[in-house]
């Protein structure tokens, strides 16, 4: 009778803590015992090599490529002209490779892509982020609105030229069918090729999934941040893409109009919430790792994020259970010695310290509650709980001398800190582990890997 009661109590605790929702296992982190990673994906090589300005990325727990380059062993991003023969129209109106996917050879594209991957990522054991940045068109016909409507018009004309005998209604239906078929083949086969060639990488498309919650400019105080239901439904229809991805790369870029506002948090939160939803539906064995793209400065400016907006971006991403965040930047960051010094000052100030705060807090929570076999995620995704070091218990200290700079975190969790974490966070176990605290090793789950 006693054992039955214990089992009942354990089940009740499980349901209460997890709100009755099954939490999928997560893929183990890219680096052991690093539940939340911060990447640097900005072309700042010139700061180090030309201007002799070290941005101190490593000091502040940031993963970067050699010489802080845009692409390398940690993260490689493929723009339209870097991978295969991607059909599109650029921002200047120049046409490339047949413009629409059904007007270009997929075989030619894949052959060129193979050569490009070997050239750009020569290391076959590549274990970093492989990000394909194709934003000119979307694979779903109904999502090619605004400036992207040109791809629908071109597809209709393409179908009309091939089948002049058909009615306009049939031509439009055929154009949609042929476009979506070709777009799917281009995106899916490119992804599968990359994964076959560099199987240890984390592959996916930048800005997928999207949420289309950009109406903060018009809604003002009425803005909710929620993804429109039609867009969530359209994301569901991209299951073929999620199943073939090994990582998701949504973005949480903040425009300056959102600076230190409630709308900023709403915007970021719901984009991440949608990404985490997609991550959990993509596979049956584990949730895909989510790496959110962010900017350390407000979009289209060189103004650094406020402390509040660092919490909104970095803090929210970690608390929601993402595997990491990727800081993207432009050539402006390294355009002059003054630009480099500005980035360095921000890195040595609020940005670097907050990154250390969150990455350390995530690591401590994983160690204390999940036995290093899982990461801490919010029990209630809409809560305002964050993975922060408790200021009354921890101190972040930066030491520097003529040869090196290092960050040391001193302190320990107090009882009230443990209570806060237990009340607000739960464990998402890595593959092969289960239990409330990821304390049970499961050979069955390992065999699924």
Swiss-Prot record:
This is Hyaluronidase. It comes from Echis pyramidum leakeyi (Leakey's carpet viper). It is found in: Secreted. Residues 1-23 form the signal peptide. InterPro entries: Aldolase_TIM (IPR013785), Glycoside_hydrolase_SF (IPR017853), Hyaluronidase (IPR018155). Expressed by the venom gland. GO terms for molecular function: hyalurononglucosaminidase activity. Disulfide bonds join 47-340, 211-227, 365-376, 370-427, 429-438. GO terms for biological process: carbohydrate metabolic process; hyaluronan catabolic process. The lineage of its organism: Eukaryota, Metazoa, Chordata, Craniata, Vertebrata.
